[in-house]
């Protein structure tokens, strides 16, 4: 993903906040969306206790991203849609990069999606993976090139 110190990063799937904390050490600001309220609340407490003031967590459906803080330099997704959600593509800054697992429950690929300066998306399959499914994916999505 090549994170930079001034990057604005969207994380989908906060979990307990470990990856959020790691990201917060190397980028400027992290916005993280977690669909499970209990996990989000635990992450908020842990991140606050550890002094991570540059991470904001909210409860919500990651499919929709966090448009109020877009565009993002980087997007990292930790649950797999069958195809890349258009809201996440739309919230990726020109020149930005997204890492996302994509596919069916038994056939997923970790994908690097890059948006060029003209807004075109190029994707590259990195490796086979197995993630939990991204909830709320019931809308048309972007097909990989």
Task: Please annotate each region the language model reported.
Residues 2-118:
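Conserved nucleotide-cofactor-binding alpha/beta core module
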Residues 103-145:
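Active-site capping/gating segments
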